From Swiss-Prot:
<dbReference type="InterPro" id="IPR053931">
    <property type="entry name" value="RapZ_C"/>
</dbReference>
<comment type="function">
    <text>Displays ATPase and GTPase activities.</text>
</comment>
<dbReference type="GO" id="GO:0005524">
    <property type="term" value="F:ATP binding"/>
</dbReference>
<feature type="binding site">
    <location>
        <begin position="72"/>
        <end position="75"/>
    </location>
    <ligand>
        <name>GTP</name>
    </ligand>
</feature>
<feature type="binding site">
    <location>
        <begin position="27"/>
        <end position="34"/>
    </location>
    <ligand>
        <name>ATP</name>
    </ligand>
</feature>
<dbReference type="InterPro" id="IPR027417">
    <property type="entry name" value="P-loop_NTPase"/>
</dbReference>
<keyword id="KW-0547">Nucleotide-binding</keyword>
<protein>
    <recommendedName>
        <fullName>Nucleotide-binding protein GOX0815</fullName>
    </recommendedName>
</protein>
<comment type="similarity">
    <text>Belongs to the RapZ-like family.</text>
</comment>
<dbReference type="InterPro" id="IPR053930">
    <property type="entry name" value="RapZ-like_N"/>
</dbReference>
<dbReference type="Pfam" id="PF22740">
    <property type="entry name" value="PapZ_C"/>
</dbReference>
<keyword id="KW-0342">GTP-binding</keyword>
<dbReference type="InterPro" id="IPR005337">
    <property type="entry name" value="RapZ-like"/>
</dbReference>
<keyword id="KW-0067">ATP-binding</keyword>
<dbReference type="GO" id="GO:0005525">
    <property type="term" value="F:GTP binding"/>
</dbReference>
<dbReference type="Pfam" id="PF03668">
    <property type="entry name" value="RapZ-like_N"/>
</dbReference>
């Protein structure tokens, strides 16, 4: 189960500590492009929204900080094919890491947002909004197909969208595969950004133990309870073996991000235990880049926040010659 992240051209082995980040942010109207740009600006990126396409190279060629450029159907001279051509030209710039971000949401969600804000859809002058959403989806389809990261905001509240962007782009890390390990609860919905999902609901549930119920998979008593299930060693071993096979292949094909999600009934005990164990073991066995941990349901309840299991390397401490 995946929100497919597509490979980008260029070097993908290790980190390019000296690279400047250039992000092209596009997507459907109402899907959160402006919100993403605001977060990137807070993270220190220079943000330019909707410049004429023929100015993109000039903007990117200027020396300076990381750059985020917003592009959508309102951009002067917009054609998806032209945007992709400009993207390939950007990737020829020296010492630049160039990525395409695409924001999307379900049509009914977009319709609800436009209705709530009373904004006019850029492709609709009169009548209902839905035909405009469908037309824009078709116009932007080539960009979504080539995006390095697709962000579906259908059920992503603004604070979680901000957290997602901060975890992806708030570091100074360079090229490489960033792995996100996420626990979640199935009743709250599948994480749309997940590339791989594993279901841990068949394991013994600590929820039904009165002593363990208020605890989480961050507590040792819960960890030992979950691991005592006879099926746990084989289940975890299969997940570990699969990730040790797949993640290096993701690196080889140029993926920039991989989200591995583990789900259970409440997102509190079993899935948290497994994510924590993966975060402990995988950095020793899989040669990828930064690795982050997010316990979605615990974060929503204020019981945990995202953290780096393997932080991005600090360019100032790079000792390579």
């Amino acid at each position: 189960m995946a929100s497919a992240n597509h490979p980008e051209s260029g070097s993908i082995s290790g980190y390019d500590h000296g690279s400047r980040r250039i992000l092209i942010v596009t997507g459907l109207s109402g899907a959160g492009k402006s919100s993403i740009l605001r977060v990137l600006e807070d993270l220190g990126h220079e943000v330019v929204d909707n410049p004429p396409l023929n100015l993109i190279q000039a903007l990117a060629s200027r020396a300076g900080q990381n750059l985020a450029i917003g592009i959508d159907v309102r951009s002067r001279g917009f054609e998806a094919s032209r945007v992709l051509e400009e993207l390939e030209r950007l990737r020829l710039l020296p010492d630049c890491s160039v990525q395409l971000l695409y924001a999307t949401a379900e049509p009914e969600i977009l319709l609800r947002r436009f209705t709530a804000t009373r904004r006019r859809h850029p492709l609709v002058t009169s009548g209902t909004i839905l035909p405009g959403i469908e037309q824009e989806t078709a116009l932007l389809a080539p960009l979504r197909a080539n995006a390095d990261l697709v962000i579906d905001t259908s059920d992503l509240p603004s604070p979680e969208l901000r957290q997602l962007i901060e975890t992806r782009f708030g570091s100074t890390g360079g090229e490489g595969l960033t792995v996100a390990l996420m626990s979640f609860a199935y009743p709250s919905g599948l994480p749309r950004e997940a590339d791989m999902v594993f279901d841990a609901r068949f394991l013994r549930n600590p929820h039904y133990d009165p002593t363990l119920q208020p605890m989480t998979g961050l507590d040792e008593a819960v960890v030992q309870y979950v691991k005592s299930d006879p099926a746990y060693p084989a289940f975890f071993g299969h997940i570990q073996s699969l990730l040790e096979l797949v993640l290096p292949r993701f690196v080889a094909e140029g993926k920039k991000y991989a989200t591995i999600a583990i789900g259970c009934s409440g997102g509190r005990h079993r899935s948290v235990t497994i994510v924590e164990e993966l975060a402990r073991i995988l950095p020793k066995t899989v040669p990828v880049g930064p690795m982050m941990v997010l316990h979605r349901e615990l974060a929503r309840k204020g019981l945990a926040s995202w953290r780096w299991a393997v932080p991005p390397q600090d360019p100032s401490q790079d000792t390579t010659v």
